[in-house]
Every structure is written in structure tokens, then in C-alpha cells.
Amino acid sequence: MKMTVAITNHNQHAMVKETIELLLSSATKPAHIYVLSDGKPFWDFTGDPRVVPLNNTGKFTGRCGNRNSVIAPFLESGDDAIVFMDGDCFPDTPDFLENYAILLDNHDLVFGTRRHTPVTGLHMPPSDLLTANMDNLYHCEPLNYADLRLVSGAVGAWRNSRTFSERLDLMLTGMIGWSCNFGFSRNGLERLREFQKSTYGLDEGIFDSNAFQEGWGYEDVAMGIDALYAGLDITITDGVRVGHHSHDRSDGLFDHVKGRHAIMERYRGLEKASESWEWVKRAAIVASAFFTGGLITGLVTCAITMQSMMGIN
């Protein structure tokens, strides 16, 4: 499987260089590594033709635009799958890409997990790390640096879910679709883009910069919800884990309110569209039944008439 790796970069050059070195030295090597920069320009230091800097400006900046910038190059490359990583993350195991290749051969969309590095010396540690360690902090016990989604049981809940409603509930909590570490098969990405284009008119990528250009995050949660409604095969696993260079968080206590509101608005819109589409399908079935019923009645009548005529003769 030929794989693309896309690394977002906002003035995180030193960390990105370390990640590139790890990827190029892994047993399963990427066909392309795109560095998506919307801050200071990034210049390739390896001389390796697989490393492609995309120094973005204009509409290809910000959380959505920067990631969207790699969609067209990936699709043009002919590679089979694409893995996205944040610039402050690095592969946490030597078989990182090998495991992704196996997973993306069987799933459309894969969310991996992340492990935080020690937070010694930080004034405002990552909020998800604090949430995962509320009990530990209260009892003055050592911190657990594992992913909040593992600690909370969200990964296990997704694995045990059986219905669309169960998975939708998990997606809406924001505890599945994180953009720090995820991957698409080519087919899964193309299907998601078709769904988003027909639903929102989105045609430049998979992250909706119109709905999520302000406030804190949640464009990744929205992408996951879209993928669920598009019918993609989605999994989340600790089998593809990144390490996260812990740093002081940049979000405040109420920064997530606007993002949560946008998510619920998106969900309500998708539900309405889904209900409308269900009505159209049911109407088509009824119309088909009437048409088919009328046709059958006509054929039966014709057959009876012919038999009657043959009997007379």
C-alpha cells in the first residue's frame, strides 16, 4: 500500500523535522510526506523527493484550510491512503505506518490515539490530560499520560457499539473524531468528499472552513460526524498511537462553547436532510409499488383474455 503522510505545521519546525526522520527510518516508508505550513515557511532539509513542503497562504490557512491543502495533491498522487498528524506529534511505535496500512486496508477511516509527554514545568497542561486525571489529581496520585478516549472508555464503547445511534452518540460527545492522528483510505476519502459536496457544497477538502473558521476546534468532530452519515466504515484504536509533545494549552474554559453549538447545528441539519431523503425513498417505493402493481394487473388481465379467446376458438 502506498501511503501519504500529511503533517500540519504552525511554526513547529524542529518537531516536524524529528517526525520526518522517524517516518523515513521506519520499516514501512511513506510514498509522500507533505508538510502543511500556515506560519513561517518550511523548507525540506532532507533532499528526499518524498518530502513536499506546502507553504500555504489565503484560503489554505487555519485549522481547516491548512489540512484541506493536501487533499488535491494526495488524490493526484495515486497513493492508496493518507495519514494526518499534528505538528507537535510523532509516531510512538516503530510499526506505526505498518499498522495503519493494515487498518486502512479494512476500514475507510481510522482514528488513532495519542500519549502525552511529561508536563513538568508547564503552567497550563493540556485540558484533555487534566480531564483524564481528575481522580489522580484529587488523590495526589501520579498522572496517567494515556489518551483521554482510552481512559474514559470511549475507545472500548466504540468497539462494542452495534447501531448507528450508538456511534452517533459517541461522535457527538467529541470523544472519537480527533484530528491529531487519523487516516483515510482513498475510497473512504472520495466517498466522504462526494457526501460533503452534495450536502454542503464543500469541494475544496474535508474540513468545513465556512462553519468552523472561528472559535476553538470541532472541525474534526464535524468531519467524523459527516463520515458517519456518509456510511463510512470507521474505527478507533490504540494500535496506531502518536506521542504528543506536551505544551501549555491555548484554549480557555469557554472556548469550546461555540464549537459545541456548531456541532449540534450540523447534527440537526444532517438529521433533517436524512429525514427528507428517507421520505423521498419511501415515496419512490410506494410509486414503484403502484406502477408494478398496475403492470402486473395489466399482464394478468391480458393473459386471462388470451386464454378466454383461445378457449372460444
Predicted features, each with a name:
Residues 146-156, 163-184:
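A recurrent flexible, glycine/aromatic-enriched loop bordering the glycosyltransferase active site
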Residues 214-222:
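Acidic donor-binding loop at a coil-to-helix junction in glycosyltransferase catalytic cores
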Residues 110-130, 135-137:
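Short beta-strand-to-loop element that shapes/binds the nucleotide-sugar donor at the catalytic cleft/hinge
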Residues 1-22:
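N-proximal low-complexity "stem/linker" segments adjacent to membrane-targeting elements
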Residues 57-74:
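Glycine-rich, basic loop-to-helix element that forms the pyrophosphate-binding segment
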Residues 79-90:
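Short beta-strand-to-loop acidic/aromatic patch adjacent to the donor-nucleotide binding site
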Residues 21-30:
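Short, acidic, metal-binding catalytic loop of nucleotide-sugar glycosyltransferases
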Residues 89-102:
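Acidic donor-binding/catalytic loop of UDP-sugar-dependent glycosyltransferases
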